[in-house]
Design a protein with these regions (language model features):
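RNase H-like nuclease fold core
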Residues: 1-49, 53, 57-66, 138-149
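RNase H catalytic domain
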Residues: 10-17, 55-135, 139, 144
């Protein structure tokens, strides 16, 4: 099955309150479009952590092997997948060349999920004209704002 996954993460402060929003879309054999939204947040987190959580939650929801087109405005995630960073971190025992890999447990989980699917990652400009990225941003912002007073 072909699936499109859009995801965005947000934090106010880094660290600070944050949220993520994710949309999964697929077209069934009859041509019907199906969408599912996911969102969540944490009181004290970082933007990168929320970006990762959004992608992970979307992939966790897939119950069978899928061809996934991932769209994210996080260059960190897209570059990690497309430029071999994830592979290199794994090879080094989940460390960066210069030391600690932040959110290593999330990168490990993402790596396991990626092994179950054929994922192609694409960068999209945030806060621009991509309808689904903007919807994910709104979901992430709403979750983040639950933790701000």
């Amino acid at each position: 099955m072909k699936v499109t996954l859009y995801s965005d993460g947000s934090s106010r402060g880094n660290p600070g309150p944050g949220g993520y929003g994710t949309i999964l879309r697929y077209v069934d054999p009859k041509g019907n479009v199906h969408e599912r939204e996911f969102s969540g947040g944490e009181k004290e987190t970082t933007n990168n952590r929320m970006e990762l959580m959004g992608v992970i939650e979307g992939l966790r929801a897939l119950k069978e092997k899928c061809a996934v087109e991932l769209f994210s405005d996080s260059q960190y995630i897209v570059n990690a997948l497309n430029n071999g960073w994830l592979r290199d971190w794994k090879r080094r025992g989940w460390k960066r060349r210069d030391g600690e890999l932040k959110n290593a447990e999330l990168w490990q989980e993402l790596d396991g999920l990626l092994a179950k699917h054929a994922v192609t990652a694409h960068w999209v400009k945030g806060h621009a004209d991509n309808e689904y990225n903007n919807r994910c941003d709104a979901l992430a912002t709403a979750e983040r704002d639950k933790y701000t007073t």
